[in-house]
């Protein structure tokens, strides 16, 4: 029977492919895009920079978590996706952004709501492991900063609601395994969300 070192690359690839397939609907929503908006260029460039930073942080967390799952056989790909459903780990929609008629107010609102959601999901992963703690903390801060940037722009445009949203119920992880498996799914969902966000923002930043 092959050992962990032999099975690790195959399991890692299978897990990444399965997670990518489960995220495909989000990426498919990214076409086509409507005409560019009149959002300030400085705001859009700042957002693009923040997205790239979060993508780097998220990729680092995702790589460590997926590698652990593959190496120590903690997460079978199909079981991991089923666990995500049972734990109620949600997706953040961006349906108002990549469409023929871009809804600017709705898009900014969904960007902010999505970031706020992932901020809560990342907070739910606290205590996942001492090794991953610093990476998780950095990721939380960067997501919170990006959400603040979006909210401030909404306020400047008069699009912000009277009150900021409150965090809903987050998944409850009953074991260290569930927390690590949930971490893989949260990181994957966040990366898919950021891919679409980046594409939309880059389009809007075009002259």
UniProtKB/Swiss-Prot annotation:
PROSITE patterns: INTERLEUKIN_6 (PS00254)
Quaternary structure and partners: Monomer.
Gene: CSF3
Principal location listed in the UniProt entry: secreted
SUPFAM superfamilies per record: 4-helical cytokines
Protein name as it appears in the record: Granulocyte colony-stimulating factor
Residues making up the signal peptide according to the UniProt record: 1-30
Pfam families documented for this protein: GCSF (PF16647)
Protein family per UniProt: Belongs to the IL-6 superfamily.
CC annotations in GO: endocytic vesicle lumen; extracellular region; extracellular space; lysosomal lumen
UniProt-recorded Gene Ontology molecular function terms: cytokine activity; enzyme binding; granulocyte colony-stimulating factor receptor binding; growth factor activity
């Amino acid at each position: 029977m092959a050992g962990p070192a032999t099975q690790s690359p195959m399991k890692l690839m299978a897990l990444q492919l399965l997670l990518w397939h489960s995220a495909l609907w989000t990426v498919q929503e990214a076409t086509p895009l409507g005409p560019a908006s009149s959002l300030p260029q400085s705001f859009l460039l700042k957002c693009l920079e923040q997205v790239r930073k979060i993508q780097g942080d998220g990729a680092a967390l995702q790589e460590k978590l997926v590698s652990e799952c593959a190496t120590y056989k903690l997460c079978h790909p199909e079981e991991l996706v089923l666990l995500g459903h049972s734990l109620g780990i949600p997706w953040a929609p961006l349906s108002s952004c990549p469409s023929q008629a871009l809804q600017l107010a709705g898009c900014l609102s969904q960007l902010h709501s999505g970031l706020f959601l992932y901020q809560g999901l990342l907070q739910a992963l606290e205590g996942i492991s001492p090794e991953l703690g610093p990476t998780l903390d950095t990721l939380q801060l960067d997501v919170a900063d990006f959400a603040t940037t979006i909210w401030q722009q909404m306020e400047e445009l008069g699009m912000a609601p009277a009150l900021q949203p409150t965090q809903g119920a987050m998944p409850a992880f009953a074991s260290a395994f569930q927390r690590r498996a949930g971490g893989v799914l949260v990181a994957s969902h966040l990366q898919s969300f950021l891919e679409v966000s980046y594409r939309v923002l880059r389009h809007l930043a075009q002259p």
